[in-house]
Amino acid sequence: MKQMQKRIINISSYKKPSVWKKVKSFTAFSIIAVMLLGITPMLSTYAAEQNYYKWDISPEKIDLVDLSAYFDGYEGSFVLYNLKSDTWSIYDIDHATLRTSPNSTYKIYDALFGLEEDIITPKDSFMTWNGTDYPFEAWNANHNLYSAMDSSVNWYFQEIDRQLGTSALKNYMKKIGYGNENIDSGLSFYWMQSTLKISPVEQVQLLTDLYNNNFDFAPENVNAVKDSICLLSSYRKSFYGKTGTGRVNGQDVNGWFVGFVEIDENTYFFTTNIQSNSNATGRNATEITKSILSDLNIWEY
């Protein structure tokens, strides 16, 4: 009864808003709406900028090349750095500076961190398989650095991360400047179509820094990582590389191949990234890379 009386009193005491009050309310609403509309594109622009690498380089050092014929059915880019001449050849500069998940190409640096922390060593990198049934037969076995890199064994590198811990991993990310350095999605998944992202240009820069040991890591550790990604070696020529494939909803949408070629007195560093709704695999990125390098007379197949 008291509640009913209170409601009646409130209704009887209600006064219709004046025209001026309505105008003030509408004006305030309009200002807020305009502010929100103004902020939204700013936030979108900021997010977009975060996805791109801000590359500070003289345009004279870059040769923009048309390699679209090699990328039939794919979006993506090819980046080549000539160490001797300090020059770049790039197909699709927009995609070359676009950051995306590194997937298994990141294992190059994860191995390096594990070596630096003595989780593994150049002489003893053996890890025992824990018996978990993995989707690839090659993963269901014991591994060392070389076999794990060759078969791209996820659990091997996840174990390195587990022993490293988040704090140490973040410090290493910052030390080498790995892409956006974001591992917030967790130690098991951050490099697999998740929060960690890097551009093709940055991939080449990091490979160059690794090759020259600009990180000032133990030389034997750097050499161990180089050896683990050596694919072919012959007199006066060596070919190094690592693939990566990103899968979303059962489809391969993000393919990588990164590496370098040593020839006589020069070294060429490369990255190929392909993206599509399907079939964008590291293997297909590798085939594209081989065709380009062959046509450039850098490596014959």
Regions found by a protein language model. Give the residues of each.
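Short, well-structured active-site flanking segments
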Residues: 115-132, 218-222
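Active-site helix/loop module of the DD-peptidase/beta-lactamase fold
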Residues: 126-147, 173-181
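Mid-domain, small-residue-enriched loop/turn segments at the edges of structured enzyme/sensor domains
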Residues: 144-145, 157-208
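Short hydrophobic alpha-helical segments used for membrane anchoring or interfacial signaling
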Residues: 78-84
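Short, conserved catalytic-motif segment at the N-terminal edge
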Residues: 84-97
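Hydrophobic topogenic segments
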Residues: 1-48
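Structured C-terminal helix/loop/strand segments within mature extracytoplasmic catalytic/sensor domains
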Residues: 45-72, 82, 99, 162-165, ...
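Active-site SXXK
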Residues: 99-124, 148, 270
